[in-house]
């Protein structure tokens, strides 16, 4: 019974996630939030929880994945022709690698978080900025360090 519920959950989740597309204008945060109002709510919630500025969260997503929810690093080429392994396990909006993502899920007690959900990705970015601030003493508002 539990196995069936998991399958149904992942089928519904897959259908809903596949409806996501890249915003039309990724250069303008106001245009992004006009097009995707829930993204603003998620980014604001991450700001309130972790103190990571919304503009910095969007800068991370823009730089890492250009708002492509299925972004992955390009494959290496074998003999300069045959697609081979990817250089890392980074994936999704935040391009979080698997190990760091697992640490985030453990520390935030959020085992259902996925790298393809914008909500989870901006929460991860907020958590990451918060951890960086705590450990390295880099300002949460400093996008250049």
PLM features: residue spans?
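Catalytic glycan-binding domains that act on GlcNAc-containing polysaccharides
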Residues: 21-145
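Enrichment for repetitive, rod-forming helical segments
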Residues: 12-13, 71
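Hydrophobic transmembrane signal anchors and adjacent membrane-proximal interface regions, especially
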Residues: 2-3, 45
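Sec-dependent signal peptide recognition
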Residues: 3-12
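C-terminal motif of bacterial Sec signal peptides marking the signal peptidase cleavage site
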Residues: 17-18
């Amino acid at each position: 019974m539990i196995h069936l519920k998991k399958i149904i959950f992942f089928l519904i989740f897959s259908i809903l996630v596949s409806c996501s597309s890249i915003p039309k204008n990724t250069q303008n945060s106001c245009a992004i939030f006009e097009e995707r109002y829930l993204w603003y709510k998620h980014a604001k919630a991450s700001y309130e929880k972790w103190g990571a500025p919304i503009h910095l969260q969007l800068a991370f997503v823009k730089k890492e994945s250009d708002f492509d929810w299925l972004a992955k690093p390009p494959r290496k080429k074998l003999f300069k022709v045959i697609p081979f392994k990817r250089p890392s396990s980074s994936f999704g909006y935040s391009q979080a690698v698997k190990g760091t993502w697992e640490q985030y899920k453990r520390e935030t007690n959020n085992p259902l978080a996925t790298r393809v959900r914008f909500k989870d990705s901006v929460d991860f970015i907020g958590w990451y900025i918060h951890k960086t601030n705590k450990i390295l003493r880099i300002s949460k508002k400093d996008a250049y360090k």
